[in-house]
Design a protein with these regions (language model features):
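Phosphate-binding glycine-rich loops of NTP-binding sites
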Residues: 22-62, 66-69, 74, 80
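Conserved A-loop
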Residues: 17-20
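A generic local structural motif
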Residues: 13-15, 49, 94
Length: 162
């Protein structure tokens, strides 16, 4: 379960330390545009391992702390790289390779970032593909990182509960 979340330079401006109550509700208040909804979305993105969300958000570092006292999981953004406890992920490196997959005749582009698979009528977004590609590449160990450590990291997140 999450105990605390620390944001450094959310939207390039705000530094927050949010302590979450174990036995109750934590209320987040503030003026419009100060990040309340973004904080909730970042918690969801953390638990669903949504790298795309973190690649598009404006921040320097977000740290998630567990009640179990485990080492916090820190997500940093440096240019086009997302660094999760030392593991570097460059989302832009994957986009070209993913888009090459859509040059097959059964994919039809329906707008700037969505395609339809004519075989199944499934609509596929670019974000979904990038997320799937990142997860499969890192989990399969096809990139030059230590796959076992990354799998342990994923397991650690999955064991955390709301």
């Amino acid at each position: 379960m999450l105990k605390k979340i620390v944001y450094k330079k959310l939207f390039g401006v705000f530094d927050y330390e949010i302590n979450l109550k174990e036995d109750g509700v934590t209320i987040i208040t503030g003026p419009n545009g100060f990040g309340k909804s973004t904080i909730l979305k970042s918690i969801d993105a953390f638990y669903s391992f949504n790298i795309i969300f973190f690649s598009r958000l404006d921040y320097e570092k977000i740290s998630f702390f567990s009640v179990e006292g485990k080492e916090p999981i820190s997500i940093e953004k440096k240019g086009q790289k997302i660094i999760i406890n030392g593991f570097e992920i460059n989302v832009n490196d994957f986009q070209d390779e993913i888009l090459r997959k859509f040059r097959r005749p059964y994919y039809y582009r329906i707008d700037e970032s969505r395609w339809i698979d004519r075989r199944t009528d499934e609509i596929i977004s670019e974000d979904d593909l990038i997320q799937e590609y990142i997860s499969s590449r890192y989990m399969d160990g096809e990139i030059g990182i230590q796959n076992t450590e990354f799998q342990n990291y994923i397991q650690n997140i999955l064991q955390w509960q709301f």
